[in-house]
């Protein structure tokens, strides 16, 4: 049976680091990138006698996330010890939640191929992050950096409702956009503040019994997620087809080889010997707190996209791209306010943000907060076009230069000599040269092939190095060609 005869079944576990200033059970800072083992204390290090104290901001962020995702907020939840040994876990256990998580149920809405679906959530729970093993730092071997130990996490667990890689990526992008809009997570996959484990299984199409699942780790980009799941699905199908059996295990994705490899046998809950954390009381949530947080919820990506489509006439595709990152949506709103709101302006700004600006941001790996171009500058570029100071090709060059340097658009136009030529006398000479060099095309145009006008315009634009005003060039050509 080919792969297409099997149904892929996916469930995702997302670990989202919360944007708190201090860790979940102590006052150590959560900043990324400090020197190894400098953001630590006896609690982080798991020293005997050090007692945890819950950060109230973590609870509020968990409730905010649960409300945004339609979860039931549990009025009483309990922390538990998850016992396992690993060098980056100094206590020998992780403080997490098990039987009584803070949120249950809920879901994430996705759309793939024009079909809308709601992917159910099992639970959301609070837990502490582990440290980090650092390899190749000394000739003697590896080291352990515990700066990350105790950083607060939300683990968001989906039901096995996903049926394709495209659905899995759509789910992650939608969830990431929601968490960023809520201000609880920065969505950074590369730094590991938004990371995902995938439970992958296959079953023959038409079957009702789920196959044995494998958990995949080490996927810090959407591209790696696609590669890892695709490889794992093919591996499982080939194993089943050859008469083998899929073992329940944890597998690590190797991005250099594009394949997964066995890491360890998959543990069940009883292997972790969960029991209630004796050093922390139950988390009690009252109705007043929940209602306050509900009132303070910001506009979520789905509502923002609907507003852009309804009020500004944007296409669903443009709107979804703008709301995929809160920073991009905020930049769009600020540019629209600086330029003047109208459906035409919204479309032009969306085209720039989803086109040239997105390309540059990807090329330079920059998040919106690090862009050197400002909304007022993007609005100024549009006004330069309105005044016919620059044309489309010139605007593209100005956007790139301002994005890279932060220089003012008018200054870039002046220094780079990008001002559009609208003087008929200057353009007429270029038009005459093009027509003289294209006698055959001129004859065919006058014989009825009017589509050649675009060819002539293109040749004149080449002659003027993209600076000719297209409207003036068109008028001159039509006059000289006889309509």
Curated annotation (Swiss-Prot):
It catalyses: L-glutamyl-tRNA(Gln) + L-glutamine + ATP + H2O = L-glutaminyl-tRNA(Gln) + L-glutamate + ADP + phosphate + H(+); L-aspartyl-tRNA(Asn) + L-glutamine + ATP + H2O = L-asparaginyl-tRNA(Asn) + L-glutamate + ADP + phosphate + 2 H(+). Gene3D superfamilies: 1.10.10.410, GatB domain, N-terminal subdomain. Keywords: ATP-binding, Ligase, Nucleotide-binding, Protein biosynthesis. SMART domains: GatB_Yqey (SM00845). PROSITE patterns: GATB. The keyword ATP-binding applies. One of its GO terms (molecular function) is ATP binding. InterPro entries: Asn/Gln-tRNA_amidoTrfase_suB/E (IPR017959), Asn/Gln-tRNA_Trfase_suB/E_cat (IPR006075), Asn/Gln_amidotransferase (IPR018027), Asn/Gln_tRNA_amidoTrase-B-like (IPR003789), GatB (IPR004413), GatB_C_1 (IPR042114), GatB_Yqey_C_2 (IPR023168), Gln-tRNA_amidoTrfase_suB_CS (IPR017958). Heterotrimer of A, B and C subunits. This is Aspartyl/glutamyl-tRNA(Asn/Gln) amidotransferase subunit B.
């Amino acid at each position: 049976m080919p792969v297409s005869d099997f149904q892929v079944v996916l469930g995702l576990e997302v670990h989202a680091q919360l944007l708190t200033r201090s860790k979940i059970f102590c006052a150590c800072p959560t900043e990324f990138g400090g020197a190894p083992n400098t953001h630590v204390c006896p609690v982080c290090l798991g020293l005997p006698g050090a007692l945890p104290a819950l950060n109230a901001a973590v609870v509020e962020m968990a409730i905010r996330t649960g409300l945004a995702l339609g979860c039931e907020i549990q009025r009483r939840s309990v922390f538990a010890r998850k016992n396992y040994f690993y060098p980056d876990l100094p206590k020998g256990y992780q403080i997490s939640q098990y039987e009584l998580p803070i949120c249950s149920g809920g879901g994430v809405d996705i759309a793939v191929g024009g079909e809308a679906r709601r992917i159910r959530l099992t639970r959301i729970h609070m837990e502490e992050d582990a440290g980090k093993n650092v390899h190749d730092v000394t000739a003697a071997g590896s080291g352990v950096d515990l700066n990350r130990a105790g950083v607060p996490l939300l683990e968001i667990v989906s039901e096995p409702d996903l049926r394709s890689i495209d659905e899995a990526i759509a789910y992650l992008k939608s969830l990431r956009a929601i968490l960023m809009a809520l201000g609880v997570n920065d969505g950074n996959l590369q730094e590991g503040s938004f990371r995902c484990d995938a439970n992958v299984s296959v079953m023959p199409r038409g079957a009702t019994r789920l196959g044995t699942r494998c958990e995949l780790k080490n996927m810090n980009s959407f591209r790696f997620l696609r590669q890892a799941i695709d490889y794992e699905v093919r591996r499982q199908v080939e194993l089943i087809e050859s008469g083998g059996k899929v073992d329940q295990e944890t597998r690590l994705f190797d991005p250099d080889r594009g394949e997964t490899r066995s890491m360890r046998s998959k543990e069940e809950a009883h292997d972790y010997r969960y029991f209630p954390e004796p050093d922390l009381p139950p988390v009690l949530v009252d109705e007043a707190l929940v209602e306050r947080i509900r009132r303070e919820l910001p506009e979520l990506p789905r509502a923002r996209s609907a507003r852009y489509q309804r009020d500004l006439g944007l296409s669903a595709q443009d709107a979804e791209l703008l709301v995929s990152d809160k920073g991009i949506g905020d930049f769009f709103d600020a540019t629209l306010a600086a330029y003047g709101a109208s459906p035409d302006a919204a479309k032009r700004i969306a085209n720039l943000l989803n086109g040239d600006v997105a390309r540059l941001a990807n090329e330079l790996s920059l998040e919106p907060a690090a862009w050197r171009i400002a909304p007022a500058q993007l609005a100024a570029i549009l006004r330069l076009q309105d005044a016919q100071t620059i044309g489309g090709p010139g605007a593209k060059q100005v956007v790139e230069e301002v994005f890279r340097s932060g220089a003012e658009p008018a200054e870039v136009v002046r220094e780079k000599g990008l001002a559009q030529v609208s003087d008929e006398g200057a353009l007429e000479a270029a038009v005459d040269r093009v027509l003289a060099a294209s006698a055959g095309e001129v004859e065919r145009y006058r014989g009825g092939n009017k589509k050649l006008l675009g060819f002539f315009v293109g040749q004149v634009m080449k002659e003027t190095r993209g600076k000719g005003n297209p409207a003036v060039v068109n008028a001159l050509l039509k006059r000289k060609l006889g309509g």
